[in-house]
Amino acid sequence: MSLGIGIIGAGGRMGRMLIEVVHRQPGVHVAAATDRTGGEAVGRDAGELAGQGSLGVPIGDDIPAAVAASDAVIDFSLPEATETVAAACAEAGRPLVLGTTGLGETQREAVHRLAEQVAVMHAANYSTGVTLLTALVEQAARAIGVYSDIEIIEAHHRHKVDAPSGTALRLGEAVADALGRDLSQCAVYGREGHTGERDPQTIGFETIRAGDIVGDHTVLFGGDGERVELTHKASSRTTFASGAVRAAAWVVEQPPGLYDMRDMIGV
């Protein structure tokens, strides 16, 4: 039986890519799609919006109705919608794949409450390559982190509105956790002017916004006489959309709880 997927934020870049990937992938179909009230995508056919021809699925702005019409929900919209999506998933008993980054405290709490009732996958990045990178970064941090200056460099397209990226922050958390540090206390975001010598306990973040870069992330471990750089470069958003669709098929089989991509691929 085909799995019906509801796509929240269908009018955005990732939303359109999700429609395309779901349409092309066997075993799943677009059951419902929403965009923000007043958005240009509302009222259009989801398939036509994504360049896939008519799917007979109009894009609406009623999140609870879209969630109820779906077997699983994928949300790549904005943090402002997260609490509404979580409440709708709780009411309908639908598992959620959440790709929204930049969540505030109340939004994170809503996600955690939802995970007590249904399976929730929340990841900053749905690429299997980035998931593997995170595991490798943890290993490197445990092996050489205490002897290294650690910097995280990320690059994205000019339209990205948050910095550092959610993926960069997750990589920073992986390093900090491996070293027993608190990222909120040791992170340094950019440098300017007379900064003095580098504090060896810090984890640095550098951000690049330019052109149409899909997403590059490098974690650099700098030691005396050598350095190790672990890098992932995405060339297409398809990798993120495909990972999210695989996650949706996975979460419907899981008990209630909060999961990430590492749970799914086993690293």
Swiss-Prot record:
| Highest taxon, organism lineage | Bacteria
Query: Which residues hold (S)-2,3,4,5-tetrahydrodipicolinate?
Result: H157, G166, T167
Q: Record-annotated residues binding NADP(+)?
A: R36
Q: Is the keyword Zinc-finger in the record?
A: no
Q: Does the keyword Ligase apply?
A: no
Q: Where is the active site?
A: H156 (proton donor/acceptor), K160 (proton donor)
Tell me one GO biological process term: diaminopimelate biosynthetic process
Q: Which residues bind NAD(+)?
A: G9, A10, G11, G12, R13, M14, D35, G99, T100, T101, A123, A124, N125, Y126
Subcellular localization, as worded in the UniProt entry: Cytoplasm
Q: Which reaction does it catalyse?
A: (S)-2,3,4,5-tetrahydrodipicolinate + NAD(+) + H2O = (2S,4S)-4-hydroxy-2,3,4,5-tetrahydrodipicolinate + NADH + H(+); (S)-2,3,4,5-tetrahydrodipicolinate + NADP(+) + H2O = (2S,4S)-4-hydroxy-2,3,4,5-tetrahydrodipicolinate + NADPH + H(+)
Q: What is its EC number?
A: 1.17.1.8
Primary subcellular site in the record, as a coarse category: cytoplasm
Q: In which pathway does it act?
A: Amino-acid biosynthesis; L-lysine biosynthesis via DAP pathway; (S)-tetrahydrodipicolinate from L-aspartate: step 4/4
Task: List GO terms (cellular component aspect).
Answer: cytosol
Under the heading InterPro entries, the entry gives: DapB_C (IPR022663), DapB_N (IPR000846), DapB_N_CS (IPR022664), DHDPR_bac (IPR023940), NAD(P)-bd_dom_sf (IPR036291)
What is this enzyme's class at the first EC digit?
Answer: oxidoreductase
- Which keywords does this Swiss-Prot/TrEMBL entry list? Amino-acid biosynthesis, Cytoplasm, Diaminopimelate biosynthesis, Lysine biosynthesis, NAD, NADP, Oxidoreductase
Protein role: Catalyzes the conversion of 4-hydroxy-tetrahydrodipicolinate (HTPA) to tetrahydrodipicolinate.
PANTHER family, A to Z: 4-HYDROXY-TETRAHYDRODIPICOLINATE REDUCTASE 1, CHLOROPLASTIC-RELATED, DIHYDRODIPICOLINATE REDUCTASE
Give the family from UniProt: Belongs to the DapB family.
What protein am I looking at?
4-hydroxy-tetrahydrodipicolinate reductase
The primary gene name is: dapB
